[in-house]
Structures are given as structure tokens and as C-alpha cells.
Curated annotation (Swiss-Prot):
The gene is DGAT3. Residues 153-182 are annotated as: Disordered. It catalyses: an acyl-CoA + a 1,2-diacyl-sn-glycerol = a triacyl-sn-glycerol + CoA. It comes from the Eukaryota. This is Diacylglycerol O-acyltransferase 3. Keywords: 2Fe-2S, Acyltransferase, Glycerol metabolism, Iron, Iron-sulfur, Lipid biosynthesis, Lipid metabolism, Metal-binding, Transferase. The lineage of its organism: Eukaryota, Viridiplantae, Streptophyta, Embryophyta, Tracheophyta. It is an enzyme of class 2 (transferase). GO terms for biological process: glycerol metabolic process; triglyceride biosynthetic process. Its EC number is 2.3.1.20.
Amino acid sequence: MEVSGVVLRQIPCVSSGSVAGLRLVSEFSGNTRTVGFRTRRFRGIVCNNEFADKGHVNYYIEPTRCGEEKEKVKVMEKEKKALKKKAKVLKSLSKNLDMFSSIGFGLDPEAGLVGEIQTKTISEATEILVKQLEQLKAEEKILKKQRKEEKAKAKAMKKMTEMDSESSSSSESSDSDCDKGKVVDMSSLRNKAKPVLEPLQPEATVATLPRIQEDAISCKNTSEALQIALQTSTIFPSMANPGQTLKTVEAVSVVGLPLNRVEVCMGGKCKRSGGALLLDEFQRAMTGFEGSAVACKCMGKCRDGPNVRVVKETDAVMTDSVRTPSKTLCVGVGLQDVETIVTSFFDEECSREGLGSVSY
């Protein structure tokens, strides 16, 4: 039997210098034996306090990581995420396994038919529920609109009642206590030219209407012209329209008040629009005349205020012992109208000419 082999043995160094070592090589080939020696160089130099080999330096000269390794890391991370997602899906499926079996996700074909029927019924039920929800939403919208309309109506009614509360409540009381009498709008009179009533006024300025001017020219003196003008018209020429008729209501005299007086309205709007100042001005203007200026409650026409009622005693007799004073309501009276009203109703010459009994 042939045997072949190689025996290696390192020969130790003889000297400490750079001497090449010997390696014994034995070769066996059949029955013959040959021995050979080969030299080997040391990679390092043996010195004091140094390593004999510099192989440890290669540790610090290793190549850095390239981009392929980074890509591999990314791929691994993606795979981990995919595995996590699959695990979550499997976990959820395992939890809802009973529900799927009840719906009909089974291997049995009959169970599949039952599942289809169940899905149809579920879809129909969902459609019905959706329709009911839409109907409820529409009803809620209609109710909201109705509520808004009711609120708006309530607000409008509240405003109307607040505006009319003073006038309505005062008109009811004024109808029972005192009459309305004659009504004169002072604001319309101020917009038109008024003649100045003086005893020595020329004829042309007193008689403003054409017919009155013709009658006044035919008179002999100014007193006759003034009398004709006052009989055919009133002291307020803007109200001398033949088509204008105002109602006169007989009044009952108030106990404790003078028969000849000027009543100034102290209602809400009349008082705010200067009723107190108007009362003071009337009291000042009535100092030289028979009568007085007093305050009274609302007359029911505060919308056109401030208002003044002139009460003057007349010769008309209801019974043997009761006289009926005439009442005239002046609407929209200003401070500039005080002198005109006082002189028109309470001047002696005007009263003799019948100014207090003239219809407006």
C-alpha cells in the first residue's frame, strides 16, 4: 500500500537578527523518503518593545461600508414592516372570525347562499335607515325655519305693541274723559303764508283769498274788511278749504279747572319733544289774558306731537245751568305758534268777532 504525505516542521530561529528560518519538509512516496529544507522570511522585525508582526494594523485599514449594504438594510426594514402589517391583519381576522362565520364566509356553499341573503337584507336595511335620516334632517330644517319665522313675527308684534301702547292706552282714556273737538295741524300752517292780525292792517294783506279781497275792497274801512275776512275764513288761512270738514264734539266741563285754558299734552312723545318748554311759554303768554295754561295726560295723538288743546267757553247752552266749552286740538305745535294761538283764542277783540266758535 502506497502512502504519501507531507510533514511540516518549523525550525526555530538561531539568531535574533534577520535570519531566515528553515522549514523541514518530509515527503513520503512509496518506500522512499526524501527530506527537504526551505527558507521562510519573517514579516516583522523583532525588536525590543515592538510586535514581531504588523498584521494588527490591517484592522484599522478595513474598507468602509458601501451603498449596497445600506440598500440591504432598507429592504430588510421594508420586509419587517410588511410582516408587521400581515400580523395585524391576521390578528384582526382571528378576532372577527365569529362575525365572518355568521355572515357566511365559510366553505359550505349553502352557508354562502345564506350570507348573500343576509348581505342583501343588510343593504336594504341600511338604505331604509339612510332615507329615514334624510327625512328627519329635512323635518328639522322645516322646524328651524318655522321657529325663525315665529321669532321674527314675535319681535315685530312686540315692536308694534311698544310703539302703539302709549297712544292706544291714552286714546281709550282720552275718549272717555275729554272729547277730541276740532283738530288743527300747525306744521302745515307754518309752511304756508299767514296774515298778521293787527287792528290797523291794510286790506290787501288781511284778505288773502281772491273772493275775500273783492269783498274787502267794497267795504268802507279796515274794520269791516277784517270782519268779513274772519267770518268767511279762520285765523289759520291754510285750513280755509270748503271741502275740509272736521267733527266737533260737545264737551263736559272739568271740575276744578278754569273754563278758558290751554292744555299741553304731557304724554311720552309730546313730553320728549318739548312739552315742558311749550307749557312754560304758554303760561308766560297767558299772563295778560283770561285763562291759564295747564298740563294734561296724553291726548292719543302723540305721533304728531307736541299737541295742545284750547278750551274756551261759548254761549251755547245745553241746559239751563250748564255751558258747553268748545275744544280745539292743535297738532304739531311749536314755540313760534304760542303767540298766534293765544291771541287767536283769548284776545277780547277776536272773541267778540267769534273766533272761538269758528269751525276748522
